[in-house]
């Protein structure tokens, strides 16, 4: 692309440089006229051709920028025209767009910062007076990782470095392309570093085995689409060794993905090593179900199987008392509805409002059902849980035991038990005493027995047992009249067989 007068279509008396349709089409094709250029996968063609076109575009934009003030005549005094000529209006609009593009390409602070940082790194190396000093790919990527530069800005940075005489490695573009394609890995590395740091809470701390596993993830590199397709084809091979090799390649290349997904499910009841193991099982499930012929990327397909395996394990194993999976989904629906109503109403919703939000009676939700779901969603608290700032007290120290007796109550209860035992021994036969104790639930029996249960125990028909029981009760009532003691067990007629 050329910037001479013939190509520009410049007229002697024009206030703005006029662009030919061919040049405008070329600029649009290279996306210079777009303010926010969307990210596209970097395609490396001939770098010399790219640098040539880019320098021509920037040189042309600089020419427009320098001539902006000199070409525009002074404004005349008087009334302004209602409408500018259409041709001049289009030129002004296009000029403003090109000026904005010029600023984004030349005056980008992040771009200049990256260039300055890499130049300083090169100068520090040059002071050592070594031969064949080269700026390594690792040094370049470490600086680029701190800034979110678009594709064209990164290539512009490399061109500027080459123009300054800084030697770069021949495969720098390919390494940057790999870095851009695997940007998720940098986020995963930050997660892994956070997990292995000393600042995480006790609940999130991982044991030595998990630390060793996280430290050994350097060999886990995400595969590109072509490599995944090539390896996935081997999964259908009849050779057992080839299939094992393909499975091993897909597993090792996606271990970081498992760690990234597992970290998002911390603080939900399972240890981190358990989450990783469940995620690995989901990864193996994805490998067995993957169909390469559909053209999907394996990492995208495996993400859903890993998430399903982890969430299912949390639902089955995280709670002390297991809640069915369908009830866990209902609890999640209720929590989502509660958050939506809170944002809408600006207050905590009532159970009636939640029931209506969940579908009402048509879906089987009422106030009683909502209260039951809320009760199930509560996590059990350990009595040994430490409380307070000093963490010396336990939660169980503050829980009242409703079955506990005071010394006075214990003494009275013990005295009544002795008198009852004496009353039974003095007035009833062994068989009658046994039947009364079993029917009422007196020691050594902890709960009342039915007539059938008593009959099976002493091998007597239930009707006979009922007769013996009534006879024994009459004897006890007669004895109580002479020795008034509070005996609630004598109200046998209130019991139901």
Curated annotation (Swiss-Prot):
**Bias kind Basic residues: ranges:** 74-84
- Its domain of life reads Bacteria
Disordered: annotated segments: 1-20, 62-86
> Where is motif Interaction with polymerase core subunit RpoC found?
274-277
Q: Where are the transmembrane segments?
A: none
**Annotated keywords:** Cytoplasm, DNA-binding, Sigma factor, Transcription, Transcription regulation
Give the start-end ranges of region Sigma-70 factor domain-4.
423-478
- Pfam family for this entry, one: Sigma70_r4
Q: Where is the composition biased (Basic and acidic residues)?
A: 63-73
Positions of the UniProt region annotated as Sigma-70 factor domain-2: 250-320
GO-annotated molecular function:
DNA binding; sigma factor activity
Location(s) in or outside the cell: Cytoplasm
Look up the DNA-binding region in the UniProt entry and give its residue ranges.
Answer: 451-470
Listed GO biological process terms: DNA-templated transcription initiation
Which cellular component, as a GO term, is one annotated location?
A: cytoplasm
Please list where the region (Sigma-70 factor domain-3) is annotated.
329-410
Per its UniProt record, what InterPro entries does this chain match?
RNA_pol_sigma-70_dom (IPR014284), RNA_pol_sigma70 (IPR000943), RNA_pol_sigma70_r2 (IPR007627), RNA_pol_sigma70_r3 (IPR007624), RNA_pol_sigma70_r4 (IPR007630), RNA_pol_sigma_r2 (IPR013325), RNA_pol_sigma_r3/r4-like (IPR013324), RNA_pol_sigma_RpoD_C (IPR012760)
Question: Would you identify the family this protein belongs to, as annotated?
Answer: Belongs to the sigma-70 factor family. RpoD/SigA subfamily.
Protein purpose: Sigma factors are initiation factors that promote the attachment of RNA polymerase to specific initiation sites and are then released. This sigma factor is the primary sigma factor during exponential growth.
Q: How does it assemble?
A: Interacts transiently with the RNA polymerase catalytic core.
This protein's name:
RNA polymerase sigma factor SigA
């Amino acid at each position: 692309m050329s910037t001479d007068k013939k190509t520009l279509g410049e007229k002697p008396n024009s206030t703005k440089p006029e662009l030919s349709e061919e040049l405008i089409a070329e600029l649009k094709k290279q996306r210079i006229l777009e303010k926010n250029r969307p990210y596209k996968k970097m395609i490396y063609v001939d770098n010399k051709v790219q640098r040539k076109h880019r320098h021509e575009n920037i040189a042309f934009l600089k020419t427009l920028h320098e001539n902006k003030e000199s070409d525009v005549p002074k404004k005349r005094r008087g009334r302004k025209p209602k409408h500018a000529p259409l041709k001049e209006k289009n030129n002004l609009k296009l000029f403003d767009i090109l000026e904005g593009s010029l600023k984004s390409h030349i005056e980008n602070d992040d771009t200049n910062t990256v260039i300055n940082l890499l130049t300083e790194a090169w100068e520090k190396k040059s002071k050592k007076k070594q031969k064949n000093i080269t700026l390594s790919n690792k040094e370049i990527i470490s600086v680029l990782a701190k800034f979110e530069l678009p594709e064209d800005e990164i290539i512009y940075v490399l061109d500027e470095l080459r123009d300054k005489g800084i030697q770069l490695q021949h495969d720098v573009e390919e390494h940057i392309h790999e870095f851009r394609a695997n940007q998720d890995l940098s986020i995963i590395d930050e997660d892994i570093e956070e997990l292995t740091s000393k600042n995480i809470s006790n609940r999130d701390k991982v044991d030595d085995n998990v630390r060793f596993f996280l430290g050994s993830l350097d060999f886990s590199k995400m595969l590109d689409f072509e490599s995944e397709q090539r390896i996935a084809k081997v999964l259908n091979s009849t050779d057992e060794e080839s299939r094992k090799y393909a499975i091993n390649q897909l597993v090792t290349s996606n271990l970081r993905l498992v760690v990234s997904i597992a970290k998002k499910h911390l603080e939900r009841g399972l240890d981190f090593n358990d989450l990783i193991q469940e995620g690995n099982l989901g990864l193996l499930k994805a490998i067995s179900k993957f169909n390469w012929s559909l053209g999907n990327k394996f990492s995208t397909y495996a993400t859903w199987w890993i998430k399903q395996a982890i969430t299912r394990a949390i639902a089955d194993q995280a709670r002390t008392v297991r809640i069915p999976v369908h009830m866990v989904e209902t609890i999640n629906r209720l929590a989502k509805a509660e958050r939506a109503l809170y944002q809408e109403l600006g207050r905590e919703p009532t159970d009636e409002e939640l029931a209506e939000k969940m579908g009402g009676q048509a879906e089987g939700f009422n106030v009683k059902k909502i209260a039951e779901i809320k009760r199930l969603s509560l996590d059990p608290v350990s009595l040994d849980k430490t409380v307070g700032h000093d963490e010396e007290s336990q939660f169980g120290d503050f829980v009242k035991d409703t079955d506990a007796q005071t010394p006075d109550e214990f003494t009275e209860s013990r005295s009544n038990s002795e008198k009852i035992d004496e009353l039974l021994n003095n007035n009833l036969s062994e068989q009658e005493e046994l039947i009364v104790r079993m029917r009422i639930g007196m020691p050594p029996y902890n709960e009342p027995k039915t007539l059938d249960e008593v009959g099976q125990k002493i091998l007597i028909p239930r009707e006979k047992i009922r007769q013996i029981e009534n006879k024994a009760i009459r004897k006890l009532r007669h004895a109580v009249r002479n020795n008034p003691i509070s005996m609630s067990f004598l109200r046998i007629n209130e019991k139901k067989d």
